[in-house]
Amino acid sequence: MEKKGVVIVTGSCGRIGTQIVKRLASSYSIVGFELLKAIYAAEKEELVPVDLSSDESVHQAFSHIKSMYGKKISSVIHLAAYYSFKDQFSPLYDKITVRGTHRLLEQLKNFEVEQFIFTSTMLVHQPQEPGHPITEDSPLRTDWGYPLSKVQTEKLIHEQRGKIPTVILRVAGVYDDVCHSIPISHQIQRIYEKSLESRLFSGNVHHGASFIHMQDLVDALELCVEKRKSLPEESTLLMGEPKTLSYDQMQKSIARLLGQKEFKTFQLPKLLAKLGAWMQGLLPSDTETFIKPWMVDLADDHYELCIDRAKKLLDWSPKCTLEETLPKMVDALLKDPLQWYKKNGLHMPYSLRRKFQK
């Protein structure tokens, strides 16, 4: 089958990158950009080692592209970025996310590029109250490093894209059937282990956040590539499920699936929550605590999305829902707790680990 063109995927060995490479590989010549050359590249993918923080590394990568594939590029799907819950701010956000994107755009000026897709986040928007969905024109926020870096990068793309058509996808939290979502997996873990923290929350329990299933996101990315010639020169699209489950709904659903029928969550004053998070961080442990003091102020945030623009431009809407997928996540946990913890990067307490290793 003749290929439709060349697609570059930065961060191609990540969770999202791996899935979009699989989806597009039969139709396009895929070139993956990764920090280190992985031992195993995806089938039908060429993997090129690229350090986005290095001018020379990015230049060499595109010299290779030009010599091997020519100057025409159908789409660049830019997934690679810095993200960490460890610190509220980090110089790596600017070094990798912002400056890395600048380096890509500088090199792409030497090519004929039909599309540049940047995966941003719904968190660039200020949270709203329930019943007031966020749109692409809603106010922005820059009060911590992750959304700030995305806002800065979106602005940079607008100013430096030249003639390259661009798509900005403001994506909700991504999950799949095994979970692979940091906040959801930790919430499930706390309830599964019946920890004291599972009963406490420092925010409004009636607030929540939008999420999106991995396959729905991959569908959207594929549609962006396929419809690239009919999209506006600049498009910004929110990507997520329009129905947002509150923290309390999540708590009760997870508890019920784990056989804990009566489950009540108590609101903890923010000052106490910050103090508790700070003290936990001081305790000797072989694993780092998830909740950091600075995260307590985000607990009240509510994200409910209007996805009308994505429906109109891409003819896309989510096929999966978090509500329907939670049972699959918990079922995967109950079938093989050790593997579920491992796949989600969680530390299992020794008492539990000993029980399942017998």
List each language-model region with its residue ranges.
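Glycine-rich Rossmann NAD(P)(H)-binding loop
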Residues: 176, 201-207, 235-245, 255, ...
